[in-house]
Swiss-Prot record:
GO terms for biological process: ribosome biogenesis. Associates with the 50S ribosomal subunit. This is GTPase Der. The gene is der. It comes from Nitratidesulfovibrio vulgaris (strain DP4). Transmembrane segments: none annotated. GTP 2 binds at residues 237-244, 284-288, 349-352. Residues 213-227 have a biased composition (Acidic residues). Keywords: GTP-binding, Nucleotide-binding, Repeat, Ribosome biogenesis.
Length: 495
């Protein structure tokens, strides 16, 4: 694995903006409101012909008593304790730490406590004085931070001042013996990509991912389609459906902060793990609510990031609450994924809370309500007890394989003859549609084009029959599929 460096500091000192700048992406949500980041996020800092290294963005540490940092998390409760735990785990994983401070606010007592705490870890520490907008301000704004006893560097994450120098200083903190790192495929699997997402009126996606979205140096990434690339699974669902609990249960870690408070997760967070020699990445996302219920700007950014994450995953895991049943928002999310032909499966979580006598009726109700997208797998699970969790990853891997299916044109046309012979298309306006040939236009998902004499005469039930037949003949049971009908005359011109 790559050597890692952690970004640690108080809330709102600019750690997430700095993280986005260093990895040249818009992964972390940034906002002027303190405490936006909660779960730690990881990315890769790359440079042309330069050694890559990992970087971890941690939540802002804020406690009622400054001494609590020096004494440890005992007695600290709520999100503050979980954020501190996440920061401690990040520091333990890293070879060095960047203590990020605010040059405009100056040295605060809490910064000194954090520095004292980091000194006891024995890790190399670099004090990064952020929000210093030019070289003329460096001496004035950084002078008092030298008292901390660590090397000091002034930067501006927002305007890019000294960021190349910062990268160089961070590389100097890396141990010489860790030169190899991991391969490109594994490295890319730990970075969340950025992709555009369509917006539906019932789902709030406005506002963008972060204020730094248009900054110079920010680039977009895409998920890898190669079969050997680690499987990426995106968790999606309403707030408090148990997405983070499922990630923790599936990976056997406490990687995600979990609480009964809806909206605990804000960023879309990658959690990589290995099982049976194979690598996987779960992307935990913020809960998606209806537009009318979103009043917080940070939540708007979080929802937008959640929906974008589905376009960057191989398979999306839509998590529902077994106790609450399917809500109108759940239905809208299912319809949205189905319309976009997103590979997904539905996980009905919290089955341990459903009385034993009511479980079968509850399962039947879920199946009936999801009858309109029969190809989508439906699993009843429990993050708390582990019920049916072992079925999730193998089924997701199967969906990914089905999405990559490529069928030769000759085989397709032989299948088309068999399907049409078995069931002729109905006569429409005194004319029976005539099929010429079929081809596969693309995969991801499988897309088939059938050329006929008049595409307008193909009715919806017969189109559904064609799709079901293709699924049966070629083993595409759960992946989304597109079937297009094109008009073609003797001159092979398309309408």
């Amino acid at each position: 694995m790559f050597a890692k460096i952690a970004l640690v500091g108080r809330p709102n000192v600019g750690k997430s903006t700095l993280f986005n700048r260093l990895i040249r992406s818009n992964r972390a949500i940034t906002h002027d409101m303190p405490g936006v980041t909660r779960d730690r996020m990881e990315g890769i800092v790359r440079g042309r012909n330069k050694r890559p290294f990992g970087i971890i963005d941690t939540g802002g540490i804020t406690l009622d008593g400054h001494a609590a940092v020096a004494e440890g998390p005992a007695g600290i409760r709520g999100f503050e304790a979980e954020i501190l735990r996440q920061a401690e785990e990040a520091i333990a994983e890293c070879v060095a730490v960047c203590l990020v401070v605010d040059g405009r606010e100056g040295l605060l007592p809490f910064d000194e406590h954090l520095a004292s705490y980091l000194r006891r870890t024995g890790k190399p520490v670099l004090v990064v004085v952020n929000k210093v907008d030019g070289i003329e301000k460096e001496d004035v704004l950084t002078a008092e931070f030298h008292i901390l006893g660590f090397p000091v560097l002034a930067v501006s994450a927002e305007h890019g001042h000294n960021l190349r120098w910062l990268e160089s200083e961070m590389r100097d903190l890396l141990p010489e013996e860790d030169e190899d790192g991991i391969d490109d495929d594994a490295a890319d699997a730990t970075a969340v990509a950025s992709a555009d997402a369509d917006v539906d009126a019932d789902v709030e996606t406005e506002g963008g991912t972060s204020a730094s979205e248009t900054e110079e140096g920010i680039t977009e990434e895409t998920v890898e389609d190669e079969p050997e690339a680690p499987l990426r699974l995106c968790m999606l669902g309403r707030p408090n459906a148990g997405k983070s609990s499922l990630v923790n249960a599936l990976t056997g870690t406490n990687r995600m902060i979990v609480s009964d408070v809806a909206g605990t997760t804000r960023d879309s967070v990658d959690v990589a793990f290995e099982k049976d020699g194979l690598s996987y990445t779960f992307v935990d996302t913020a809960g998606v609510r209806r537009r009318s219920r979103i009043t917080d700007t940070v939540e708007r950014y979080s929802v937008n990031s959640s929906l974008k994450s589905t376009t960057k995953a191989h398979v999306t895991l839509l998590v529902l609450d077994a106790v609450e049943g399917i809500t109108s928002q759940d239905k809208r999310l299912i319809e949205l994924l189905d319309e976009r032909k997103t590979p997904f499966m539905v996980l009905v979580n919290k089955m341990d809370l459903v009385p034993a006598k009511a479980r079968e009726d509850g399962k039947r109700n879920f199946r009936d309500l999801l009858n309109f997208c029969q190809h989508v797998p439906l699993l009843f699970v429990s993050a708390k007890t582990g019920y049916e969790l072992r079925s999730i990853v193998p089924l997701a891997a199967r969906i990914r394989r089905e999405c990559s299916v490529r069928i030769p044109t000759g085989q397709l046309n032989r299948a088309m003859e068999e399907v049409i012979t078995r069931h002729q298309p109905p006569v429409v306006r005194r004319v029976r549609p005539k099929f010429y040939y079929m081809t596969q236009a693309e995969s991801q998902p499988p897309t088939f084009v059938l050329f006929v004499n008049d595409a307008d005469r193909i009715q919806a039930p017969y189109a559904k029959y064609i799709e079901k037949s293709l699924r049966r003949l070629f083993g595409i049971e759960h992946a989304p599929m597109r079937v297009h009908f094109r008009s073609s005359h003797k001159k092979n011109s398309e309408k």
